[in-house]
Amino acid sequence: MDFMSPKFSLTDVEYPAWCQDDEVPITMQEIREIFVELMDKFGFQKSSMENMYQHLMGQLDSRASRTGAQNALVSLHVSYIGGEHANYRKWYFAAQLDLDEEIGFQNMRLHGKARQRNVKMAKKRGVSIKEQIKQWNEKEQEFINNHPKITLTQEQLEDQTNLKSADYKWKLKMKKLTPENMIRQLALYLLCWGEANQVRFAPECLCFIFKCALDYDISTSSSEKTVKSPEYSYLNDVITPLYEFLRGQVYKKDAKGNWKRREKDHKNIIGYDDINQLFWYPEGFERIILNNGERLVDKPLEERYLYFKDVAWSKVFYKTYRETRSWKHCFTNFNRFWIIHFAPFWFFTTFNSPTLYTKNYIQLLNNQPTPQVRLSVIAFGGTIACLVQILATVFEWGFVPREWPGAQHLSSRMIGLLFCLAINLGPSVYVLGFFEWDVHSKSAYIVSIVQLIIAFLTTFFFAVRPLGGLFRPYLNKDKKHRRYISSQTFTASFPKLTGRSKWFSYGLWVFVYLAKYIESYFFLTLSLRDPIRVLSIMDLSRCQGEYLLGPILCKWQAKITLVLMLLSDLGLFFLDTYLWYIICNCIFSIVLSFSLGTSILTPWKNVYSRLPKRIYSKILATSEMDVKFKAKILISQVWNAIVISMYREHLLSIEHLQRLLFQQVDSLMGDTRTLKSPTFFVAQDDSTFKSMEFFPSNSEAKRRISFFAQSLATPISEPVPVDCMPTFTVLVPHYSEKILLGLKEIIREESPKSKITVLEYLKHLHPTEWECFVKDTKLLSMEKSFLKEAESSHDEDRLEIPDALYDPRSSPLSDHTESRKLPTEDDLIKEKINDLPFSYFGFNSSEPSYTLRTRIWASLRTQTLYRTLSGFMNYSKAIKLLYRIENPSLVSLYRGNNEALENDLENMASRKFRMVVAMQRYAKFNKDEVEATELLLRAYPNMFISYLLEELEQNESEKTYYSCLTNGYAEFDEESGLRKPIFKIRLSGNPILGDGKSDNQNHSIIFYRGEYIQVIDANQDNYLEECLKIRSVLSEFEELELNPTIPYIPGIEYEEEPPPIAIVGSREYIFSENIGVLGDIAAGKEQTFGTLFARTLAEIGGKLHYGHPDFLNGIFMTTRGGLSKAQRGLHLNEDIYAGMNAICRGGKIKHSDYYQCGKGRDLGFGSILNFTTKIGAGMGEQLLSREYYYLGTQLPMDRFLSFFYAHPGFHLNNLFISFSVQLFFVLLLNLGALNHEIIACFYDKDAPITNLETPVGCYNIQPALHWVSIFVLSIFIVFFIAFAPLLIQEVLEKGIWRAASRFLHHLLSMAPLFEVFVCQVYSNSLLMDLTFGGAKYISTGRGFAITRLDFFTLYSRFVNISIYSGFQVFFMLLFAIISMWQPALLWFWITVISMCFAPFIFNPHQFAFMDFFIDYKTFIHWLFSGNTKYQKESWANFVKSSRSRFTGYKSKTVDDISEDSGHDSKKARFWNVFFAELFLPFCVFLFNFTAFSFINAQTGVSDSTPTSAVFRLLLVTFLPIFLNSIVLFLLFWVSLFVVPGLSYCCKDAGAVIAFIAHTFSVLVYLLDFELMWFLQGWNFTRTLILLITCINMHLILFKVFTTIFLTREYKNNKAHLAWWNGKWYNTGMGWSIILQPIREYFVKIMESSYFAADFFLGHFLLFIQTPIILLPFIDYWHTMVLFWMNPRSIIAHKRILTRKQRALRSRIVSKYFSLYFVMLGVLLFMLIAPFFAGDFVSSPQELLEGTLFEGIFQPNNQNNNDTGPNAPSTILTTTPTLPTFRTVA
């Protein structure tokens, strides 16, 4: 590309604000010469130079347009280099570069090993560091003395963090800069940045490169000799070595020369942040060594740049923060969260549980503990707070390497914490250890009071103070050495809240915690008081126990139940905080909404009647108009443009358009024409107009106009003239998202399992818009046909007819209706027949122009890139419209030359707005994608496309990568079929090192223009009326009025500048709402998060950046690391890191409530949960990140809570819900077992505690059972609070009626089931990520979810996530209901149904009769396939991939097809797996076992012998495993010696062997279940607890074996196939073939058990659905509920099948219908038979009486009533005397 050609030269037209300024400080030509000179000197690429030249000129022009050229240059230099908020200046002082220039890093007293090396090198040079520092101090003092404007006190002189003198020197240096110098510095920085590639993610590293380059440039500028470097020198010498180091951390080359990912977790990867943080401290610079061992700091400043190519980067970098995959991060980062929950919970609970610490408590007396014991025990809460802080500090030691200079000093903090622990714990030792608990001591009482006060103070202090500045802020420490300025600057420069925001923040959290503590105390803690009392004193010594264990375990059953109850209550204590946060946040958001006027419930705003005036005052900048017009004329142009745009989008019919337009009508005098306003503005406030319809019912047009009017009633910044507005860019990342729907995609079913086409579904969703579209198309068709007829007959009269077609307000052919004959019936029928293609497809001709219209219509109503770009290109239309309206002299200037006028408008739009689509794959697009892209480029030629180009250079094996830019005006390359690049910038290598999106944004960011960037996803939309507000939105950055004073005058105390606005967020309208329950739920959540919560969070400083429609300050963000972060996995939710980075570095984030964009959301069950999984896993990665560490340990208390509950708190809350429910069910097992085996007392809640409980010897368990109802109510509220924000948002936005309607729709559509399931997915994805890692980008479906998914697909996708645990909950719930019936437990059936059946309930057409049985066939096939050849969709593959999470994969491959399944599982660390997958399941098993042992302990049965419950459990657990192992052992030899021979005649011999093994396992487990009944004496309750315990024992055994003993998996499935077919010889495994069969043997033993479980579970899920599929018309009702479709629409769209297809389906259904019901009958019989078996074998134990196995049976129907007359004599029946306390000093 020839940049010197006139075609690409920059002219005055392109940058008029700069070029036409009379006082321009430097001309464009001079600027260009500077760029060229720098390019030659440093070896920058020519293409990059041209790009950066245009970039700088665009920014200069943007600022000059509103402030003048001189001020524009200075302000830009201030923003990039020299200003108070410029990142370069901050870094320069933070990293002590000023001292490097004056004394040199090599002569400074550094820390750690850097100090030793400095001393050693100083000795070599023969200088003294001490002497050097002394000389510098003398020079510094001399400088201060010579400049009287520097006024420093003695304290400031000693304080080296005081930068007054350094600032003075800096300003002195800046003041000396000429405009040429400023441009040179800006140009050099931009050129360095423009080719920095991945180094752009390390802003301080880039600053260092720029600093070295600047020093070199300054030193060589004065020399007469011209310094030149070859092109690509900068890239090859400076950037590529750094890139190669970064790439080498994540990838390595395999034997074939391909780059493969390393199996390293984040803590072992030196990432972008680690590299960047090296450049924060002098100690980091000192580490930079060259290949010859010399240090870079020992080289002169002006020569350092030349040595970059010799730096040994691999020896320089190290980890500055360890992202260890551990829950410990949560303890350190959120220590205050734990303190404000653990300590108050302890205070509340211990105060209300005196029985736990009362010596010799007797219920008949209800004697109380001594006061000092009570106070001391309560005061232990302070000790808990200390322990939390100590643990947080210990864990911090592991995260932050001590060698990093920014690491906090933890030793002194630990000493302080140990002291706090001592003063909190010491009194308890004195009070509880030195005195008996029934002795009253005055001294101990005083000590306990003081201890309690100290505990409260300690808890409050630790709760409020950030961990990073616990006893004294570490950032202010060590002032004499400027040590921690970098940490302050880059991690803790949080913008302060002021005024309303500050009090809002304080108020919110005071209200939340006040309400929380009051509610928790009275509702949670007081309800626990009685259960604690009854369980803590319950004596279970009358249980017989177990043969092996005796009564040891059963005696403690009440205490075990109490511990579980306390833990469950603690879970609720955490949960209800989030509940109150939601409630208070909603209330505060309502208050904000009313104060801003954004609510529909603010009638005083006169939204519609004042709309014209508001358009005039808030949309138009009329103050500087050159010609004054009546306001009405200007308003009409804006309003008509808006409604006509809606008409063109087919949102309005011609009739509606006529009612909404401003129209010219004849005046009463008749000689002039006047402008008539539409009655619409008056109608909304006047009841007489209510009958008039201005919009179609429930139309998109009405919603848009309504929001537009509402938004203009809110406070909006006054717009500046168009030519003064800042330039901005819209950036749209695109990978493989749909660009434009193809014809086949919209008129054919998505798959054979869809029953409706996309077009039909769209017609159902948008009936009015389709009608308008069809009318429009018919008019166009008629017009073309008239033209054709006219051309063929040359009849001029006929040519007049189409003229009417061009006027949308006239009816077609209206003048000819009278002359035509009335149509006959045949004519009408013929006309209807001719109209059929229009109504069905939108066209009646296969011409591309017609089909394209239908494709575009459909694409504009789905989530396509075409919709996004057509929406956001409205900015261009809006700018042109506003410019033309506000500059009426333009029209007269061009005097009817519309083309010239249009060119002028186009130039203005191009100056102020640029659209960049980051089409990463553009060069690899297929034919359809290229065609769609070309269509876009022709429609919007000003749209730019950035993309990656790969070229294989001659004689080189490595590909060369280029970052390219093109647009619709670029030349067409006939060879590739693509546009030729305008810019082609070589990269160091493949830029996609991370998850993709961040890297794509990063390589494209160099092509942005202007000052601001709006980041958009490829599934959004925008509207003309919203684009008209762009000037007001950009003014939110508070940079429109630039300060004309030059900030570089030394000695002047400038006013403190407010923090820069980094991000301006905006609202989202989710256009995928109201199209089915799932789409509406997803839309509602996104809407509330993006609007309701964002409004409050922005006000209280808790809002971050969530991508989507936010506007970013281009200079602020690009000089601080870019738009997002990009380390693979760690930065999966990449956008939020930009927000955290901005907050940490002093940027402010705002929210604009008056501007909104459209946004699409996932619509199907699977795609929504894919998104949920991505977000949950991404949060797991965020918890490990250093940003969370900085925010969690340094934010003030109120800001910390805002950050926590808005981000990690939401996900941890889901985890707490999941854990609380699981813990509660384990409690129910133990409480149910207790209730089942004891004789309960008669309970009267109003009776005094001291009354004798009857019958004598009974157990008072009713308070504990009552507490269960309270727990269930709490969980119910916590679940349903998820609907509150959406409900409130709907009330505010659309009114009470619409809100109630939407909420009712959700309830009737079973939305609560979906909410429960989503909660489970969130918690599972978070837990799994922190256990196994492997978070990755999951592409979510953006199409309509109208396709039925197979049962096995849903089963395999969700069984590990929810269905397995759902069935465990089902069994536990069933046990709880039959052992301790409570009506409240019925709520949990919703949980069970959701966890087990939600995937099937929300599957389209799940209950279609024939499809259901065809599904059964595919499920059976899935179970038994994959054993003779590799099948991706098979149970064998599913179970292997599930296992690989624990084992990981071997790196060895044999080029087998089975290795292409995306195996990227890393082997998880043992200690990560230990907690989540071993310890927690073991705890569940342990508590299951306590319930199991107690229910078999024969409590209250006299003269009985303990049974062998443990042996019984071991028998039913190991018997099927043992039998399976024998069968597998025998089948192995059969497969080894028999199957290879049989395979020649019977290809499926291996499958037969697998079938035998798996079928045998199913039968064995079926018999094992019957054996459980038999051994438990046909008692269903006891059998159920044995089954539950057996399942958990299986789980823990298999997980332990898999984790500890199993080696890694091969990526191929050769070993699996060889096990069944015996062909081990061709597996390609080498010598490992010897031991592989042994490994496979143990794997197959476990797989046999897993197979049986999946077989039974799958069938159970299907059998439960049987009654539903037999209901008449169930498919229609189900579809109506899911998609909110009209029943008529459902019936109208039946899939048409051929006769052959119908016959095949019938055969399959008849065959598998029979199999299905046979299986159902067998399993039902095996389940029901044991209920009646007791009638035939009533006492199984008699069969083995007198033998060794006699105790293996559990007796049934025993008399366990040992109360009343049978009660032991040891039980108190009379009230004893009250013991008196002994009093001592």
Swiss-Prot record:
GO terms for biological process, alphabetical: (1->3)-beta-D-glucan biosynthetic process; ascospore wall assembly; fungal-type cell wall polysaccharide biosynthetic process
Segments passing through the bilayer: 337-357, 375-395, 415-435, 444-464, 508-528, 547-567, 572-592, 712-732, 1215-1235, 1268-1288, 1303-1323, 1370-1390, 1394-1414, 1475-1495, 1514-1534, 1549-1569, 1585-1605, 1655-1675, 1713-1733
Chief site of localization: mitochondrion
Sites carrying sugar chains: 844, 874, 955, 1002, 1170, 1360, 1579, 1761
Gene Ontology CC terms, in alphabetical order: 1,3-beta-D-glucan synthase complex; endoplasmic reticulum; mitochondrion; plasma membrane; spore wall
UniProt-recorded name of the protein: 1,3-beta-glucan synthase component FKS3
Keyword Glycosyltransferase assigned: yes
Positions of the UniProt region annotated as Disordered: 791-824
Subcellular location: Mitochondrion; Membrane
Gene: FKS3
